[in-house]
Amino acid sequence: MCAMEYVRYLQESCLLISLDNYASKFTEKETVKKHYFVDNGLLHLFINNPDTLLLENLCAITLYKKYGSGVYYFNRNIEVDFYVPDEGLAVQASYRMSDESTLEHEVKALVALNSLYPLKRTIIVTYEDEGVMERDGLKIEVVPVWKWVLNGV
C-alpha cells in the first residue's frame, strides 16, 4: 500500500485535511499538498519536537474550520504557511520571533506575497509574542496563538 492511499484513508476518515499550493500548476495541485491532522493530539503521537509543528497544525485546523477549502499554502520562491485568497489573508506560524533571522524570513515572505497578490490582512501567529509592525507599507500583526484562536481568526 502506498503512502497516498494512507493519506486518502485518513482524509476519508476525517482525520486529515490537505491544503493545495495556491501557486502550483493545475497538474501539481493533486500531488503537491500539505497535510494536517484535525486533532493536535494525533500529531503529538508522531513527533519528537512538537512546538512549531503543533502551532502550525493548530493554525491549519482553525483556518480550515472557518474557510474550508478556501485555505491554501503558497510556495513559489517564497513560502507562506496559509493563504486565503478570497479574504486577502496571509498567515505565518512561527513559535518564537526572538531570533532575528526567523522574524526576517516570516516578514519577507508576507511582503513578497503582498507584491504578487495585494493582501488585506497579514498575521504572524506565535506562542506568546505580540505586536504590530509595518514593512514596505504592509501592516503585519504578531498575535499569540491563544488570542488568535479565541478571537476567531
Per-region residue spans from a language model:
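Conserved phosphate-coordination/catalytic loops
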Residues: 53-54, 101-104
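Accessory nucleic acid-recognition modules appended to NTPase machines
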Residues: 1-90
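Short active-site-adjacent structural elements
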Residues: 80-81, 99-102, 131-135
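Domain-level recognition of nuclease-like catalytic cores that cleave nucleotide substrates
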Residues: 128-153
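Short, hydrophobic beta-strand segments that form beta-sheet elements in well-ordered domains
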Residues: 72-74, 120-126
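Short, charged, amphipathic alpha-helix that recurs within catalytic cores of restriction-modification
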Residues: 103-116
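Hydrophobic/aromatic beta-strand patches that form the interior of the parallel beta-sheet core
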Residues: 36, 91, 123-125, 141-143
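Active-site ExK catalytic segment of metal-dependent nucleases
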Residues: 85-99, 106
